[in-house]
């Protein structure tokens, strides 16, 4: 019995610590987002990094505290050394923030639009308009149609990076607000979600030591309570 136990102990395999063999890679945003490091991820094989999604808040990326509710998503599309490049694949807004914007005696108007930018990128954009007072159905329809047209027109006239900047930093929302408030009193506009459906021309590869470009915020106009 003792011999059997000895053989068993001798033939037992030692578990390998796979974490020790992993290499950490820095994930960079595209140059249009500053080419900054937004996180690190481990991998045994760099090929397994391709397709991984990294999340960062717009506040952390731009140092704009007012953008804390917006989350951006970047997909790894290349690896060089210990650096992983990525491309923007979409954004969303926290549910808590969206709920906090809805008030009684106001109407909520949603629009979901598939658009294509000047350089061939296809995106699905979701926008929200909150009216200052309750709107009738025909007003809601008119505003929704106008929202969709503005989003399509801006996408068609701009390149991908410029359109994404307008979505995230308020330019698109301000355009919708300015045009639609002529039709009905509005309180707020949010471009609360986007998703890249098809990529157009090659996305520029981030470089390790690129200087971050300052991004000026285009505030969404808002009426007073």
Swiss-Prot record:
Please give an example of a GO cellular component term from this record.
ribosome
Q: Which domain of life is it from?
A: Archaea
Identify the Pfam families for this entry. Answer: Ribosomal_S3Ae
Which BP terms in the Gene Ontology apply to this protein?
Answer: translation
This protein's record includes keyword rRNA-binding: no
Keyword set, alphabetical order: Ribonucleoprotein, Ribosomal protein
Instruction: Kindly indicate whether the keyword Nucleotide-binding belongs to this entry.
Output: no
Q: Any idea which GO molecular function terms this record carries?
A: structural constituent of ribosome
Family membership:
Belongs to the eukaryotic ribosomal protein eS1 family.
- The name under which this protein is listed is Small ribosomal subunit protein eS1
Q: Provide the species name.
A: Methanococcus maripaludis (strain C6 / ATCC BAA-1332)
């Amino acid at each position: 019995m003792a011999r059997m136990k000895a053989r068993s102990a001798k033939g037992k395999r030692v578990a390998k610590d796979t974490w020790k063999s992993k290499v950490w890679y820095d994930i960079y945003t595209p140059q249009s987002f500053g080419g900054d490091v937004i996180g690190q991820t481990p991998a045994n094989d760099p090929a397994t990094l391709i397709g991984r999604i990294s999340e960062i808040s717009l506040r952390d990326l731009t140092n704009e505290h007012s953008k804390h509710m917006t989350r951006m998503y970047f997909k790894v599309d290349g690896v060089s050394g210990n650096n992983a490049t990525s491309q923007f694949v979409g954004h969303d807004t926290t549910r808590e923030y969206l709920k906090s914007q809805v008030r009684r005696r106001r109407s909520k108007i949603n629009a979901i639009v598939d658009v294509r930018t000047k350089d061939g990128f296809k995106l699905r954009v979701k926008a929200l308009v909150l009216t200052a007072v309750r709107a009738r159905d025909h007003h809601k329809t008119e505003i929704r149609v106008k929202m969709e047209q503005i989003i399509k027109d801006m996408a068609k006239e701009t390149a991908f990076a410029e359109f994404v900047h307008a979505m995230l930093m308020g330019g698109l929302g301000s355009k919708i607000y300015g045009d639609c408030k002529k039709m009905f009193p509005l309180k707020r506009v949010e471009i609360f979600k986007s998703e890249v459906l098809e990529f157009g021309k090659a996305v520029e590869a981030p470089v390790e030591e690129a200087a971050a470009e300052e991004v000026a915020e285009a505030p969404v106009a808002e009426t007073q309570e």
